[in-house]
């Protein structure tokens, strides 16, 4: 079965990309992986007294929050439609690295374009990095699903 990986960050652009991917997967008989990458913030260490941190608890909390975000997006976009298997996945990694890693096992990588124009390109957008370095074809979805 073909696999389509979609980058999810909670934005309208990523929701529209997921809508497109789900419809494409329905036509092609593919499965969809909705992938959200997150980075855990590093606690600031200073010289003053501090409350002990529950690092394992924080790790779990960040993961659960990330998984909740991508699951909520999948629920919003797909709803109760059972025609396509959509798996929400959260990974601790930078978005670019997570998507590039996932592209190695995918038939298509779909990312939304936030439309930042030239400034986004100069700063190195995730979409641009994926288009240049992914191991599979990349579709950069611009605009709404009707476009």
Please give the residue ranges for each predicted region:
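Small/aliphatic-rich secondary-structure junction motif
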Residues: 2-56, 85, 102, 133
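A short acidic, glycine-rich active-site loop
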Residues: 53-68
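Short glycine-/small-residue-rich Rossmann-like dinucleotide-binding loops
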Residues: 9, 74, 114
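Structural beta-alpha unit
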Residues: 13, 27, 75-109, 145-147
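Short, acidic/small-residue loops that bind anionic groups at enzyme active sites
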Residues: 133-143
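General small-molecule cofactor/ligand-binding pocket signal
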Residues: 33-35, 87-91, 139-141
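Short secondary-structure boundary segments
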Residues: 36, 112-114, 142-143
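Glycine-rich, Arg-bearing micro-motifs that act as flexible, cationic patches
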Residues: 108-132, 147
């Amino acid at each position: 079965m073909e696999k389509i990986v979609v980058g999810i960050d909670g934005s309208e652009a990523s929701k529209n990309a997921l809508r497109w991917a789900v419809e494409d997967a329905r036509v092609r008989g593919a499965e969809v992986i909705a992938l959200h990458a997150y980075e855990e913030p590093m606690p600031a260490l200073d010289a003053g007294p501090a409350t002990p941190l529950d690092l394992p608890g924080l790790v779990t909390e960040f993961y659960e929050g990330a998984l909740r975000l991508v699951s909520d997006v999948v629920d919003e976009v797909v709803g109760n439609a059972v025609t396509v298997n959509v798996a929400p996945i959260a990974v601790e990694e930078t978005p670019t690295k997570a998507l590039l890693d996932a592209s190695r096992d995918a038939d298509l990588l779909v990312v939304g374009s936030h439309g930042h124009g030239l400034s986004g390109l100069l700063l190195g957008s995730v979409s641009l990095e994926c288009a240049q370095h992914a191991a599979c074809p990349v579709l950069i979805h611009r605009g709404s699903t009707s476009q």
